[in-house]
Amino acid sequence: MLLRAAGCWRAAASRPGPVWLRGAEHRGLPLASRRLGLPLPLPLAAGGRRLRSGCGALPEVASFQGVAVRSLSTSAPSDHPEHGRLVYKGNLAKAVLGVRFFSYSTSIFNLFMAPYLMLKTGIGFDSLFLQAAFYGLIGFFTFVTPVTLHILTKGYVIRLYYKEEMDTYTAITYNAILAEKATVFHQKDVKIPDITKMFTTFYAKTKSMLVNPTLFPDPQDYNRLMGYDKAFCFDFEEEEKDGESK
């Protein structure tokens, strides 16, 4: 009987175990740890760190995922030490700069190359009217186009800062030589035009400014700039007097 029982025990040990047991054997490490009497590795917690056991803390694994997330979420500082907090940034700044630079380049090219081409090719007009028309056309593309572009885009706000300590706004625009120009003003200096204009959103003192309201990250900054956060007061007596005078 003892021999028969020993033979059955050996046969049972030689047969493959259940599916979940064979999967554990394929993984190797937990089964080898059980055979050698070693403690099983603890599971990983969130962030790639080992859980603490009852006997002490195991070495922690550095979390590269957290470092990557922090590096991606870190953005360039948007505050200016002199102008304050950045509240607006135009998305057409590079386009405006590129168009005006191209216009200046072509104007300079025409200014220097037109006389040279006329001398080399011998182009001439007997009629005074044709000469005036020809030189007027060259002058238009040489001088009028850059001046027109400057007038249309000189009020385009590249960046707008707000300094809470001084309650001042600083608008950055391009000047005639394509350099950045800072205009400092208060909210009380902002005047909204009575008639909607294509290239003017508001006036800062006497200078026209063009901004896109949808590009303000915080709509409250736009409301504060335009004075929409203030209560509107209507003087009905003055309205009646104006109506009677008419």
Swiss-Prot record:
Topology versus the membrane: Multi-pass membrane protein
Keywords carried by this UniProt record: Membrane, Mitochondrion, Mitochondrion inner membrane, Transit peptide, Transmembrane, Transmembrane helix
Stretches of the chain found on the membrane's Mitochondrial intermembrane side: 120-131
Transmembrane parts of this sequence: 97-119, 132-152
Keyword flag Acetylation: no
Entry GO MF terms: mitochondrial proton-transporting ATP synthase complex binding
Membrane topology, Mitochondrial matrix segments: 80-96, 153-246
Location within or outside the cell: Mitochondrion inner membrane
GO cellular component, one term: mitochondrial inner membrane
Organelle transit peptide residues: 1-79
Family: Belongs to the TMEM70 family.
Its biological purpose: Scaffold protein that participates in the c-ring assembly of mitochondrial ATP synthase (F(1)F(0) ATP synthase or complex V) by facilitating the membrane insertion and oligomer formation of the subunit c/ATP5MC1. Therefore, participates in the early stage of mitochondrial ATP synthase biogenesis and also protects subunit c/ATP5MC1 against intramitochondrial proteolysis.
Protein name according to UniProt: Transmembrane protein 70, mitochondrial
Organism in which the protein naturally occurs: Gallus gallus (Chicken)
Lineage: Eukaryota, Metazoa, Chordata, Craniata, Vertebrata
Gene that this sequence comes from: TMEM70
